[in-house]
Swiss-Prot record:
Catalytic activity: [[Fe-S] cluster scaffold protein carrying a second [4Fe-4S](2+) cluster] + N(6)-octanoyl-L-lysyl-[protein] + 2 oxidized [2Fe-2S]-[ferredoxin] + 2 S-adenosyl-L-methionine + 4 H(+) = [[Fe-S] cluster scaffold protein] + N(6)-[(R)-dihydrolipoyl]-L-lysyl-[protein] + 4 Fe(3+) + 2 hydrogen sulfide + 2 5'-deoxyadenosine + 2 L-methionine + 2 reduced [2Fe-2S]-[ferredoxin]
Annotated metabolic or biological route of this protein: Protein modification; protein lipoylation via endogenous pathway; protein N(6)-(lipoyl)lysine from octanoyl-[acyl-carrier-protein]: step 2/2
Localization per Swiss-Prot or TrEMBL: Cytoplasm
The species this protein was found in: Azorhizobium caulinodans (strain ATCC 43989 / DSM 5975 / JCM 20966 / LMG 6465 / NBRC 14845 / NCIMB 13405 / ORS 571)
Superkingdom per UniProt: Bacteria
UniProt KW keywords: 4Fe-4S, Cytoplasm, Iron, Iron-sulfur, Metal-binding, S-adenosyl-L-methionine, Transferase
Lineage: Bacteria, Pseudomonadati, Pseudomonadota, Alphaproteobacteria, Hyphomicrobiales
Protein name, as recorded: Lipoyl synthase
Similarity field: Belongs to the radical SAM superfamily. Lipoyl synthase family.
EC number: 2.8.1.8
Cofactor: how bound: Binds 2 [4Fe-4S] clusters per subunit. One cluster is coordinated with 3 cysteines and an exchangeable S-adenosyl-L-methionine.
Annotated ranges, domain Radical SAM core: 69-285
InterPro entries listed in its UniProt record: Aldolase_TIM (IPR013785), Elp3/MiaA/NifB-like_rSAM (IPR006638), Lipoyl_synth (IPR003698), rSAM (IPR007197)
Residue ranges, annotated region (Disordered): 1-22
Binding-site residues, [4Fe-4S] cluster 2: C83, C87, C90
Length: 317
């Protein structure tokens, strides 16, 4: 269980301090993972620390950090470690963020080059305090990676840029290889799970990326186990396909602390497999659906499969 208070004894989630504690369900055997600590993990951690960078792997308490960092795979989280939203599922710190580090795009590019990454994932906190939501910072980071590690393919996992006109255009113009924006949950759960966001705005963002540049792969993911119904998940799949989203991820929600949204149930591996089968039938080029699936887990391998799936589809037309 991840603590709600950081090492300086400041509340990590001040908005959650007065919430009642919820029951934490015991994890089934299929959720358990090996603790990190290998030599590869230590090397990746050293490069991240040396460049003063943040990763969503650490900040969000991802269960796959040991596996990914051992392979020198890390998802860099730009624009600081403090988010202006307060989603009930998320372990990232909430509060008023610091000013942007204008050297961060260069630092990320250097770290990508040092790690020798063939594929990198860049995400960020929400920055509602910035006039463009951080769009230009994303674009500069993409440009830095292109310059310092030209052979690396780039996947971005963005916030929703709600009420930030022109932001999406700036990011798309930087031409990432994959544009990911997670819906996170079904629309009926937004009020309690993702109250600062709007389902149809997020859906429209994904659609707009395709309209602006059809060559960019689009991707979106959800968590299950939050109390959603199966039919709601199937409708969400239809919504994503209507927006021409190429790649869908589905993973089990894991509760960071007793103050966060509770896990209503653990979805079985067979149910995840069934979701995968239905999603492929609905036309997604790529689907990753398993208890430990996360947006950037196996992202490099999945990108290669995604590209191959598009080429195969075009070859049949």
């Amino acid at each position: 269980m991840v603590t709600v208070v950081n090492t300086l004894n400041r509340p990590r989630h001040p908005e959650k301090q007065n919430r009642p504690e919820t029951e934490v369900l015991r994890k089934p055997d299929w959720i358990r993972v090996k603790a990190p600590g290998s030599a590869g993990w230590s090397n990746t951690a050293g490069i991240v620390r040396a460049n003063g960078l943040h990763t969503v792997c650490e900040e969000a308490g991802c269960p796959n950090i040991g596996e990914c960092w051992e392979k020198k795979h890390a998802t860099f989280m730009i624009m600081g470690d403090t988010c202006t939203r307060a989603c009930s599922f998320c372990n990232v710190r909430t509060g008023m963020p610091k000013a942007l580090d204008l050297d961060e795009p260069q630092k990320v590019g250097e770290a990508v080059a040092k790690l020798g990454l063939s594929h990198v994932v860049i995400t960020s906190v929400d920055r509602d305090d910035l006039t463009d939501g951080g769009a230009e910072h994303f674009a500069r980071t993409i440009a830095s990676i292109r310059k310092l590690s030209p052979g690396t393919t780039i996947e971005i996992l963005t916030p929703d840029f709600l009420r930030k006109p022109g932001a999406i255009e700036v990011v798309v113009a930087a031409r990432p290889d994959v544009f990911n924006h997670n819906l996170e949950t079904v629309p009926g759960k937004y009020l309690t799970v993702r109250p600062g966001a709007r389902y149809f705005h997020s859906l429209r963002l994904l659609q707009q990326v395709k309209e602006l540049d059809p060559s960019i792969f689009t991707k979106s993911g959800i968590m299950v186990g939050l109390g959603e119904e199966r039919n709601e998940v199937l409708q969400l799949m239809d919504d994503l396909r209507a927006a021409e989203v190429d790649f869908m991820t589905i993973g089990q929600y894991l509760q960071p602390t007793r103050k966060h949204h509770k896990v209503e149930r653990f979805v079985t591996p067979d149910e995840f497999k069934a979701y995968e089968t239905v999603a492929y039938a609905k036309g997604f080029l790529m689907v990753s659906s398993s208890p430990l699936t996360r947006s950037s887990h196996h992202a490099g391998d999945d990108f290669a499969k995604l590209r191959a799936a598009r080429e195969a589809k075009l070859g049949r037309i």
